[in-house]
Amino acid sequence: MKRPGIYLFALFYVLTLLSCANVEKYNRFIETPLAVEAMQQDINYVEHNLWKMHPDLFLYIGEDQLKTKFDSLRSTMRQPLLPNQFQLALAAVLSQVRQGHMTLSPLISKFDPKGKDKVRYQKSKGPFSQLGFHWQENTLYLSKNGTADSTLIVGSKILAIEGIQPQNLYTKYRPTFTSDGYNTTFIDRAFERLLPRYYQLELGYRDSIAVVFSRADSTYERVVVRRFEAPEQKGKVGTSHADTEKPNKKPLEKKDKPIEKKSDTKKQRKIFGYNANLKRMSKQLSFPVKGDSSIALLKVADFSYGRPKEAYRRIFDRLELNSVQYLILDLRGNLGGRLSDVRELYSYLVEADKFQFVQPAVITSKFKLPFYQIKGLPGWSYPVLSPFIIPSAVVSWTKTFSKDGTNYTHLTGSKIEKSKANRYRGDLFVLIDGGTFSAASLIATNLKVGKRAVFFGEETGGAASGTVAGVLPVLKLPNSHLRWRFGLMDVKPYYHVNEAGRGVMPDISIVRNVDDVVKGKDPVLDQVLKIIKRQ
């Protein structure tokens, strides 16, 4: 082995040992009570940075009211608490700001398998990831069964997991998260998404969970276990030596085709943003009515994955080729993502030759903004990243300006741009729900107020008037080590909305109930198709 190889091996070995030690240290810290003074310092740290860095802190709560809540929290810190007990108290105060992007994450215990087990666990599926959940009217339902157990009936009520009722978790953790403003449709979708995390906080790392179900007045219990990937077999048992040796040209030709197909599939996944965990594309075009290519459905699951310029170009070229007259844009469950992605989509939907997607964002400080953006990074990284930080700061300063005593910065889409030449000009229908959030709400607002589309579903989880996001640093609290994320920019859609704190409202309100979810029915899409058929 050459010297560089020896050094790399030694470095890898040392890092592995340090990683194991760090995991043990981290898990011990979670179970170590924090001193009262340490918690007081963390509260002061949060309060100071919140007042200094948040661009629209008092939109939904008065300054005196928020100050009183922090003072009250400090006064209740009279005895040591575990970090996650402290998180519950502090997060409940932060949620009163009513900004959905702001989160204070609890510390979740880590599991660090060794050797071959590490690879096995990385390729495995935990018990919670095999199940789908639907939370409605204070009841938890099984919406997906990804296990090998066919006796798990989708649509069953989940009464308890390892003896813990989901209603108790909702009561405990509901005060720690919020939507934008006074919206409530986001809450149920957020809870069912966060549910596995809450159970892990209560139970720790589990390879199996006992679940009590209720179905048609009967109760049954099942154990859901971690599913490991089957080990690869080098050769089939009982295969003769003669069978394994058949080197001729025809099998080689057959092997070439799947390789080409695999390569093409890989490219498609990169362009349209394949999410391996959810097994879906970020952007997917389909034609919901068999034999009718004039009606198209564009499902945009997020604005985070894929190559939007190439993806939307291909999609809208296809719409033009098929002479699509009715386009249904499905934004349900879209939690947002990159501003550049959603702006690109909007440029294909707007009717005018020119457009502006968002207004310049309000910020607290022109000079300090680039340094706020990196505030959550560890101290040792600053010298390493300084060659990149300084040029980035200069670019950031060139985008900022002041007007009437308020500081602003330009964003992607905050200047007037040309619409796409092959933009869609037909009828547009948009599907929304409580999971339509952040950037997805921005485009929904512009399409709604701009009278470009008809909306179906339920009120969006994100506020129609905008959101505080843009750049979201994650700060580590000095003593509790809790991770605190919040936005630095007040991002508003181009079209002004007077009422703050409510989402984009549907023109036709339709809510999917649990039976629809379980049976795979989509009454929202069905209603749109009925209206199109009448036209």
Model-derived regions, located:
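Bacterial Sec-dependent N-terminal signal peptides
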Residues: 1-27, 46
